[in-house]
Amino acid sequence: MDDRPPPHPEPSASDSDSDSSSENPLASISPSEIRVAIFCALPIESVAVRYTLDEEYQCRPPRHHPQSKYVFTYGRIGEHKVVLARPHQIGPVKAALCAAAVSGLFPTVRFALMVGIGAGIPGKRDIRLGDLAVGVPRENHPGVVEYDLGKYEKDGFVLKGALNKPHPVLVSADGALEEEEIMGRRPLRRVLRELMRRPGYGRPDLADVLYDPGFHHVNKGEDCRACDVADDSKVVARPVRAGKRGYPVVHRGLILSGRGVIKNPEDLDRLRRGQDDAICFEMEAAGIVDEIPCLVIRGICDYADTHKQDGWHRYAAAVAAAYCKAVLCKIDGPEELEDPVKQRTGDAFGEDLRLDADWCRRPHLE
């Protein structure tokens, strides 16, 4: 399966305007009403997020602004008006340019979420395809680190430099969702079920196989059918998961972000050595988190190896989009800012956002 969007392509801004004006015009909002930015790198990711919007809007940011070359989607999730942005290309540099554009065009944006697919890092944690990786800060890391800035030493890979942490209210909302999980509830159930009805976004009927790191993909450029006939010694044995089959498990920890795609098992082993909390590789977050406080959410679509797992891409994107909505619906809508400059000063804007105590009574997320 390729990375093209579903059969109904994502409409351009001009298409949306023409269709909506003749049939069902979109309501208009001001750029100053937008408080949340959502970033996606691939069309399949942004389409998954659009499917979770409770409402779409029209919005006209200043055309004279030097960063107005991007086309955005505007909508509402829960009580939050959001701008959905997609860089022109993948990678941290393009992501940073897009984040800077969002900051310039929408100065009232308080925080962001990076939503999409990523490569799981199997090891001490039982990470499976279709699971979730969330970059949550710990005492020894901010939730996301840029592995391009580190260096290899004899004891493993040593990370250098530091990136900003996600906004505290996003971390608190994630913690509230973790409490729901511990209590045996499934906060993603309804949203994910609705997403899985969309063309191409259902859970694939494919085996989730973790191959031995030393076993390279057979027949480059093709799927893993030739790999599947290998003897059992090439496959990592894993127990059947308890609980509801197929429901994603959320893994919280360190996300490694960089410019290159990790496929070499030796590089993977060196990077994760000494980084016990590392759960996922991805390529854009490092360009965003220093521009806007950002929570990184990735659906696991492969294991950072040479084996092709393209059939999991859209489902992994759907899982990430569902979790993004769950996080935002945990947070009350922000009050109007008296001084927009305060939003860039860390804790200054934490006072305007409160966790929603009525989470369990939200019917659309039961």
Label every PLM stretch briefly.
Residues 2-352:
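Intrinsic-disorder/coil detector with helix-boundary
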